[in-house]
Amino acid sequence: LLLFPRLAAVAEVAWSSPTEKRWDRFLMTLDNYQERWEMKGIQPSRAMYNIGHEVVPSFGGLRVSLNCVRPDGEIRYTTDGSEPHRYSSIYRRPWIVKKTQVIKCATFKDGEQMGQTLVLPIRMNPVTGRNLLRSNPIERRMVNGVRGSLKCTDGEWASWAKNDSIVLTFDVGSHKGLHHLLLGCLNN
C-alpha cells in the first residue's frame, strides 16, 4: 500500500524542524517502519525502490542510464533477457547499446530484491539512434528503440497538444529503402 510510506513522510515533514530534515536519516526511519508494518501483516509499497531510466541516442547507439531514489540500494541488471539476481552485474554508470537486446534490472539491498523488475526491450532498426531534424528532447524518445507501454507515465511517450502540428524528419544516414513504418499512439 502506497498509503503507509506516504503517511510516514507526512509525519516526518510535520514533526521535524527544517534543519532536522535529512533524507538519509528518514530512509533509516522508514526502513524501521516497514519492518513493523510487515510484522503486522501490512505490505507497504516499495515503489521507492523501482528504477527510472533514460535511453537516448548517443555515439551511433543508445545511451542507457538507470536511477533509483534510494541511494542505499544496488541496481543489478542483465542484458540477455534473464531475470536479475543478487549476483548480476552492478550498474555503475550509463553504457552504450548498439544491438537489439532486452535489459532487465532491479534494486537490491543486502542481496534481496526490493523493487519491481524494470524490463527494457531495445529494438534496433534503421532509424534507432539517428538524428531527428528539428527535434526537442521529448521527440528524441521516438528514435530510442524503446516502445512506450500502456502506462503513459513510463517516460517513453512524447505528447503534443491538440493544436500542435509536428513534422518529424528522420536522418537514416544514407539512401536506404524503408519498407514500413510503425508508429505507436496513445490517444486520450
Regions found by a protein language model. Give the residues of each.
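Extracellular and analogous surface-interaction loops
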Residues: V167-H179
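Short, compositionally stereotyped local motifs that mark structural "simplifiers"
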Residues: S17, K21, L27-L168
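A short beta-strand element within beta-rich, extracytoplasmic domains
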Residues: K176-N188
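Active-site core of glycosidic bond-cleaving carbohydrate-active enzymes
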Residues: L1-K21
